[in-house]
């Protein structure tokens, strides 16, 4: 059954040049899990005949039922390459001299946008990515998102065009049209790569190129695939041409004239594009003969391509026969495997250029050098990217990758959570690792130790980590960088147990839920509510189902989904706001003003961040946003959480004792930024200026207890005098549909305050792509509504895109923002009505 044992895999783990860590990424429903099957069956884990239907990596019951991948799953597989293929691996760090075997750690990740946090976790522990694109629908919004994430993490992509069977059987494209489709997809992918990749960077050439063999074509469902390398091998002997030369000739503007045996770069009447003639024609002939049941032709063709049909398959015809023939002529596992082994980097190569992206500490300490050289003798550095639930309720495997050193069963290690700072004790545990295990899709295998460059699971550290963290044996190690998610949790639901006696179980269940999903947030409100926040409707639905069935095991009542809002201001405060401390000895004078457009986004994406050098940051703000240089240098802090899109600027001149109260003012600012004045939602895009401070001369009269609440009152007064506004989150919605259904889409979007900003036809197909902005608040039940209005022909994908100001003034009764504020205040148990300015503003 399986072609290898755990001991063999353990042996391969030391040959780090022959390891490939890769993930499969793509748009939803482009066929990742189906394609993964052909690799898994090549390794002998599942029967070849079942490949394409098994979806081996969809391990959960709801994944099989819904036919979507929800969690990313890992499999380790062992393969051997033939001598003739090994020649293509030129870099000495890409393979050991005498070793033909390769250990491939493959992670199948979900394509659905609601689970893109799972993709981020998968990308962090891998070095290469197989990007799957459906050749009928082309490059979609999610393909772009995941590809962008991959490039940002410095992960090398290779491309696979899936669903060729659809292009031939359903759309019945001509060879030339099909070539143009491929050409367009390759160009689109390369444009995305070029946009996000730094040219001349350490990764070298990242763009994909069919003539180099880094692009594959085929059909995962039927289990066949090829790269230009396979076809060149068939022709190289016959034409007596060098293989690499031929591969270059088979793609692009190369035309061949069979009469005169001449190549040319132009299209004439009697010559034909080489890709169509030598690659597509044979495939078309096989398809044509089999689907039109031409018995004699089939036998001739099979002799030519060297396929013999087994006895039990001899009475098949039509699609069934097509599958058998294509599968034995161009087996998908083989083509994919060669692409992976030849074009994806080994840990030795990849960690050289990924270290600076991964490690927060100095780039020349022991840990950094260990990661850079992928050295199993260096101190252990392992990054845990997610938690995987075990069969034992409430316990988790920590799933991650060893970047340097080796992890051994029973060794003592430092477990550092994401909030750990070197030299402090918080978020740090010294514990023993109970067991190390190997992840195999649906099964796990125990293993003694795992050296650097490999992916594994750990038992016994789940109590000390929430979701992610670093495990190390090096005393002065810093953390590995925290993962950046491309979506943010904006949809929330309040949950409560149906039977109040079950409350402790619910709390316990929420803790486990927070562990098991990289993205979900569980919040305890002060009013005693338990809130679960997720990326979208589907994400929340799956999380609540898990909570009910696996984590808490009790029946649960849930509220309607609620959207998080943000508070902001529209203009500068109309007066200088003054607040006095409770003992009347200290006074603060401040104003609020909105940030210029684009700055909050710059802060979110880290182009302006608190860790920058203040001079470079000030220069950036002055050039791009025309801030005053002296003020831009005196940004005290960002908030909320020290990194959010609001700033506190010191514009005062020569104030005594100012630095002594800085900490207290900052604490008050963080408090106000986290809970705004209108509805206690986070602030966004507000800049507060401190103009003057009068303080008492005795230090005892200006302690934190005097200053912090005063700062908060003063900031609230600033907000109320600066025309407060609410912001709501907006989805970018991409909808695929045939031309007839476009009208129905506009109707649905208009009813839901959405607006279309782009509409394009996918060249070569009858499909239209409509892009629109849709407020998250209006998106509940959108999919069902859309399908009923278009006869089930439209497929939407919604990604969180940006925040936009809700039109209207929340201070005017009966306006929409006013109602939102009232509902939120009621839900949070605050006093009804609007906050009163006189509570916060003092007279001189």
Curated annotation (Swiss-Prot):
Main subcellular location: cytoplasm
Localization of this protein: Cytoplasm
What reaction does this catalyse?
Answer: GTP + H2O = GDP + phosphate + H(+)
The protein's enzyme class: hydrolase
Which amino acid positions bind GTP, per UniProt? 26-33, 162-165, 219-221
Residues with PTM Phosphoserine: 488
Iron keyword on record: no
Q: Which superkingdom is the protein from?
A: Eukaryota
- Transmembrane as a keyword of this entry, yes or no, is no
Q: Which residues carry this modification: Diphthamide?
A: 701
CC terms in the record's Gene Ontology section: cytosol; ribonucleoprotein complex
Instruction: Report domain tr-type G positions.
Output: 17-348
PTM info: Phosphorylation by EF-2 kinase completely inactivates EF-2.
What EC number(s) has UniProt assigned to this enzyme? 3.6.5.-
Give the family from UniProt. Answer: Belongs to the TRAFAC class translation factor GTPase superfamily. Classic translation factor GTPase family. EF-G/EF-2 subfamily.
> What does the UniProt function comment say about this protein?
Catalyzes the GTP-dependent ribosomal translocation step during translation elongation. During this step, the ribosome changes from the pre-translocational (PRE) to the post-translocational (POST) state as the newly formed A-site-bound peptidyl-tRNA and P-site-bound deacylated tRNA move to the P and E sites, respectively. Catalyzes the coordinated movement of the two tRNA molecules, the mRNA and conformational changes in the ribosome.
| NCBIfam families, alphabetized | small_GTP
Question: What is the name attached to this protein's record?
Answer: Translation elongation factor 2
To which species is this protein native? Answer: Bombyx mori
């Amino acid at each position: 059954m399986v072609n290898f044992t755990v001991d063999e895999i353990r042996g391969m783990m030391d040959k780090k040049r022959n390891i490939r860590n890769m993930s499969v990424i793509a748009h939803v429903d482009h066929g990742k899990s189906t394609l993964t099957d052909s690799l898994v069956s090549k390794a002998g884990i599942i029967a070849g005949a079942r490949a394409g239907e098994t979806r081996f990596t969809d391990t959960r019951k709801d994944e099989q039922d819904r036919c979507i991948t929800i969690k990313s799953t890992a499999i380790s597989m062992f393969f051997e390459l033939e001598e003739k293929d090994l020649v293509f691996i030129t870099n000495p760090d890409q393979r050991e001299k005498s070793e033909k075997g390769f250990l491939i750690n493959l992670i199948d990740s979900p394509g659905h946008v609601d689970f893109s946090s799972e993709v981020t976790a998968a990308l962090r522990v891998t070095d290469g990515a197989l990007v799957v694109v459906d050749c009928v629908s082309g490059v979609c919004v999610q393909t772009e998102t995941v590809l962008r994430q991959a490039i940002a993490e410095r992960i090398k992509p290779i491309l696979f065009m899936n669903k060729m069977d659809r292009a031939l059987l359903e759309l019945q494209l001509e060879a030339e049209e099909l070539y143009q489709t491929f050409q367009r997809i390759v160009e689109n992918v390369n444009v995305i790569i070029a946009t996000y990749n730094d040219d001349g960077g350490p990764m070298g050439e990242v763009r994909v190129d069919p003539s180099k063999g880094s692009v594959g074509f085929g059909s995962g469902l039927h289990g066949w695939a090829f790269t230009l390398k396979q076809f060149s091998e068939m022709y190289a002997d016959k034409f007596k041409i060098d293989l690499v030369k031929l591969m270059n000739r088979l793609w692009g503007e190369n035309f061949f004239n069979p009469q005169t045996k001449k190549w040319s770069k132009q299209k004439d009447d009697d010559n034909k594009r080489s890709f169509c003639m030598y690659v597509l024609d044979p495939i078309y002939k096989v398809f044509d003969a089999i689907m039109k049941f031409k018995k004699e032709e089939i036998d001739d063709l099979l002799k030519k391509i060297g396929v013999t049909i087994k006895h039990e398959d001899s009475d098949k015809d039509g699609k069934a026969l097509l599958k058998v023939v294509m599968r034995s002529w161009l087996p998908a596992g083989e083509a994919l495997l060669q692409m992976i082994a030849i074009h994806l980097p080994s840990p030795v190569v990849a960690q050289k250029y990924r270290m600076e992206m991964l490690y927060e500490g100095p780039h020349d300490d022991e840990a950094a050098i260990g990661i850079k050289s992928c050295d199993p003798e260096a101190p252990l550095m392992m990054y845990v990217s997610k938690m995987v639930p075990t069969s034992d309720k409430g316990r988790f495997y920590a799933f991650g990758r060893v970047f340097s050193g080796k992890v051994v069963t029973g060794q003592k290690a430092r477990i550092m959570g994401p909030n750990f700072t070197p030299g402090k004790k918080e978020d740090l545990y010294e514990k023993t690792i109970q067991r190390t295990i190997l992840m195999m899709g649906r099964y796990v295998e125990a293993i003694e130790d795992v050296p650097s460059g490999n992916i594994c699971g750990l038992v016994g550290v789940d109590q000390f980590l929430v979701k992610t963290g670093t495990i190390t044996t090096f005393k002065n190690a810093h953390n590995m960088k925290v993962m950046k998610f491309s979506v943010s949790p904006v949809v929330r639901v309040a949950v409560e147990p149906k039977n109040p006696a079950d409350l402790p179980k619910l709390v316990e269940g929420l803790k486990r839920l927070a562990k098991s999903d990289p993205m979900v947030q569980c919040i305890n409100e002060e009013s005693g509510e338990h809130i679960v926040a997720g990326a979208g409707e589907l994400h929340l639905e799956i999380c609540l189902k898990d909570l009910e069935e696996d984590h808490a095991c009790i029946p649960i009542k849930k509220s309607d989904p609620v959207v998080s809002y943000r508070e902001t201001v529209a203009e500068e405060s109309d007066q200088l706001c003054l607040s006095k401390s409770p003992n009347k000895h200290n006074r603060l004078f401040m104003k609020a003003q909105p940030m210029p457009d684009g700055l909050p986004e710059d802060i979110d994406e880290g182009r302006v961040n608190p860790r920058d050098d203040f001079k470079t940051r000030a220069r950036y703000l002055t050039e791009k946003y025309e801030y005053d240089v002296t003020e831009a240098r005196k940004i005290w802090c960002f908030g909320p959480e020290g990194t959010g899109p609001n700033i506190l600027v010191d514009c005062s001149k020569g104030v005594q004792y100012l630095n002594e109260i800085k900490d207290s003012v900052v604490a008050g600012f963080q408090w106000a930024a986290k809970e705004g004045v209108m509805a206690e939602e986070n602030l966004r895009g507000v800049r507060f200026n401190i103009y003057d401070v009068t303080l008492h001369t005795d230090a005892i009269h200006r302690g934190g207890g005097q200053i912090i609440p005063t700062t908060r009152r003063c900031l609230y007064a600033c907000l109320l005098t600066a025309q407060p506004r609410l912001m709501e989150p907006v989805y970018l919605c991409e909808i695929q549909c045939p031309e007839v259904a476009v009208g129905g889409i506009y109707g649905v979007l208009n009813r839901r305050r959405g607006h279309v900003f782009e509409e394009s036809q996918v060249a070569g197909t009858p499909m239209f792509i409509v892009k629109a902005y849709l407020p998250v608040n209006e998106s509940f039940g959108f999919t069902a509504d859309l399908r009923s209005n278009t006869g089930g022909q439209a497929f939407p994908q919604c990604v969180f895109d940006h925040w936009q100001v809700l039109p209207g003034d929340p201070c005017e009764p009966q306006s929409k923002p006013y109602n939102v504020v009232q509902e939120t205040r009621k839900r949070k148990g605050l006093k009804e009505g609007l906050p009163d300015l006189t509570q916060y503003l003092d007279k001189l």
